[in-house]
Regions:
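N-terminal auxiliary segments of SAM/dcSAM-dependent transferases
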Residues: 2-77
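Short secondary-structure junction motifs
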Residues: 26-27, 116, 165
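SAM-dependent Rossmann-like transferase core, predominantly class I methyltransferases
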Residues: 48, 57-140, 144-159, 170-181
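Structured loop/turn residues at beta-strand edges in well-structured enzyme cores
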Residues: 166, 182-183
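Conserved small/polar residues in nucleotide/adenosyl-binding loops
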Residues: 185-187
Length: 187
């Protein structure tokens, strides 16, 4: 990629992604450029007419190649949004689906409708911890347990819990086995 303004670079990356059938190529291009240059959205927008620094172009080219090869954008950027919060994700965990946010909403609604003051919630196969952490943050009186068979996934979940300031009890194990011995689990 030759020397270009930020705006021209966005257009060039958009065209490249579009040529390979990447859905929403313009958004992908802007996000990949921000990732490569470590810019905020505000910085990117306020510098559209400036020349893009060339020192990070190889990084950008690598990121674009990964996206063209269909690597999920969230794995490339290392983050995803879930329930209005940013969670770290990588290949050790599945990317939380937007539909899973409904599970959080329904769990909260269920607890409120039942009038459970101090609910105990279990998230089996927690992955990134997005569901467990979101429930814990939305219901501070809840005691939340999260399990996963993968120690690597639990590292990601624990990192997210620490970053978002919540206490979820994480344990490694297969399905509900690690929750045996706990008294009543409400959800």
């Amino acid at each position: 990629m030759a020397t270009k303004t930020v705006s021209t670079l966005i257009k060039a990356v958009t065209a490249q992604l579009s040529a390979f059938g990447i859905e929403d190529p313009a958004t992908n291009a802007r996000l990949l450029i921000r990732q490569a240059f470590r810019w905020s959205a505000t910085h990117q927008l306020s510098n559209l007419s400036n020349i893009a620094p060339t020192d990070q172009l190889p990084v950008l080219e690598s990121l674009v190649e990964r996206r063209i090869n269909r690597e999920p954008l969230s794995y490339i950027t290392g983050k995803t949004e879930f329930f209005k919060r940013h969670f770290t994700v990588d290949e050790r965990v599945l990317i939380p689906r937007p539909e899973s946010e409904q599970l959080v909403v329904r769990a909260i609604d269920y607890v409120r409708k039942c009038g459970i003051e101090n609910p105990r919630v279990a998230d089996v196969g927690t992955g990134s911890g997005a569901i467990a952490i979101s429930i814990a943050l939305e219901m501070p009186s809840a005691e939340v347990f999260a399990t996963d068979i993968s120690s690597e996934a639990l590292k990601v979940a624990q990192m997210n819990a620490h970053k978002l300031g919540d206490e979820v009890e994480f344990t490694q194990g297969n399905l509900m086995g690690t929750l045996q011995g706990l008294s009543l689990i409400h959800i």
